[in-house]
């Protein structure tokens, strides 16, 4: 009975209001839970609060990760990875991504950028048993944290196996959780903070260049800082700062006076070393620590030594209008500052560039300054500017240019100025690059110049791309600006105010120039050392700042010794890379007006050899709108500029092979050099000088090409070709004599068609390249020439059916002249020789099989028709 009553009580109907209330509560709970997991997972963060607290309230909160056994660190074997940095960016145009790349480029470190995948394919990380990357950088560390399980495991295994570290940045925004745990790590983040007074942890193991003795007083830029907190032994603070306000950070288990803004993960948690930044690179100390992080995580493979060589040039000595020149007190200050700087830079010496014509052309007080400067002549280094400060590219006659230099040299001799420094600078860097041949010759003739410098190679901006090169026996060094120009002579009138100049020096552009370049030549001017003496102020403050914040060892050398040191560090820069002077307005302004870019060819026939390039050269020359180069006395119709030593003769030498353009716009020059095709240097060089050029290559069966080259060498009495049969040549092993292997390479390597065309494709768009069927050029030249004319876009199309005739005696097509006669190629073309033996053909068919398959894929990708011989070869491989 009682059981029955209880049952009836439980079975009473529930009131509708209570049901609705329960449903509403469940909905709220569901929304909260969904937001908790979805939002936290998407951000790669897990909310931090009391629920994350350890059962022991006296102990700072820890993650379950802390309870896992510590994994032993695998020693870094840097020999197993290539010195390449993989940079994952948010987009190709993101500011932080560009700043990361800029530092790597300035340091001349090789890198590869990839859009960071949330899901999808990870770039190939290994090549056989080698790692392709020595360091991974994430612009947004959450893209790493939120990788799908497959790619995350792939990347982490790679980092552990090859000892590769990770650098990551966390940039908070308005949607960031104020306090959260980084998913999967015993690390807590507190975001959107304003910070001040940044200091460096002197115990941080990654510090190399950074000197940890000082505190950067004042507010850090922005209110979106993130600080890191953990009690796991794997995390070591690198930079620390205070909060702007005295309030404690919510959810922070310990009220610390200093908070970690850059943290180093020693790899004790999962075997991977990392460095994490709580903001971007806007703060100058982050740039400095980033450089150290790259060095540390790569075992100093990607690192510059601590030595920095500095040379300060003062151009325009004696030049300048009244009121801008140096007076007696300014000259004394120059000398005193030099002595002061020598306490930090052994033998530091200002390098003075003079134009003697303007001596004693100031006020009386300024003329006295000139006299005092000359009385100190032995205290400084000296170099010649131009006598009258004229730009050398305006002198088209070398003898006139030499006369100007001779006047300056006489002035130097008369006043005891040294004339054997071997260094000179041209006003406005005119004539140095683009090269004015007359300047280089006159410099050597009058002064014996061995070194100069310019800010124009390869371009003025961005400055991090400036390089050196060697031309005509003169070493050219990159020159840097320092924020001072001829018009910046008063501190309070500095553009943007004095704070802008101080910002450039203290952690800004000038500081970074020295930080990221082992050798820096700075351009200043006479006017920077009069009035407020901004030149002295700038370099005293710079040296003080460098000594305070870095372990860099500042040194100096005279210009010639400095040049040798530069090319000892960067030997790969000796070879210049000539560029189109008309593509850069500054270059065009300092290039002789007697020269024109219209004299450059618009078409190159690049080969390869023995495919019909000479025939195409002849056929193109028949067109009234097309003009070929003048023949070379050494290499016949070929200039062979881009692939060998002729390149070092410069673009003036190259242009001499082409006519001076007429006033018509229809001038279309072309050249043919068949060994450009397989040259490793030619594609990059051509693209630099002729970025809009059209490229034509002719392909025949590579086996036939190899055999033709062998027969060509026999006809020219090559002793190796005479001694060995074709089969012996192509089958020669690695132990064969060197000259035999050289002939083998010239027979076989040009036939790697896909390899060579891909190299050209790295520098030219597919629509700039035309691949011709050499077999059709031989049998149906008129039809092929119609294709060529369409490719070139010539307005006056020529009907080659009417201008070409087959010569049965020669066995190929020739130019048809008036009266029915023909003009054919010389007797060296179209030679008859025995057919290739079947064993050799079979060997070469197998040898080139994979190359031909790759060629077919490449031509399909380029949208080009497959040559008839290639279709036949592919059919035979099935």
From Swiss-Prot:
SS bond partners: 814-824
UniProt GO molecular function: deacetylase activity; heparan sulfate N-deacetylase activity; heparan sulfate N-sulfotransferase activity
Membrane topology reported for the UniProt record: Single-pass type II membrane protein
EC numbers, comma separated: 3.5.1.-, 2.8.2.8
Protein's recorded name: Bifunctional heparan sulfate N-deacetylase/N-sulfotransferase 1
Annotated catalytic residues: 610
Function text: Essential bifunctional enzyme that catalyzes both the N-deacetylation and the N-sulfation of glucosamine (GlcNAc) of the glycosaminoglycan in heparan sulfate. Modifies the GlcNAc-GlcA disaccharide repeating sugar backbone to make N-sulfated heparosan, a prerequisite substrate for later modifications in heparin biosynthesis. Plays a role in determining the extent and pattern of sulfation of heparan sulfate.
Subunit field text: Monomer.
Keywords: Disulfide bond, Glycoprotein, Golgi apparatus, Hydrolase, Membrane, Multifunctional enzyme, Signal-anchor, Transferase, Transmembrane, Transmembrane helix
Transmembrane domains' residue ranges: 18-38
Stated family: Belongs to the sulfotransferase 1 family. NDST subfamily.
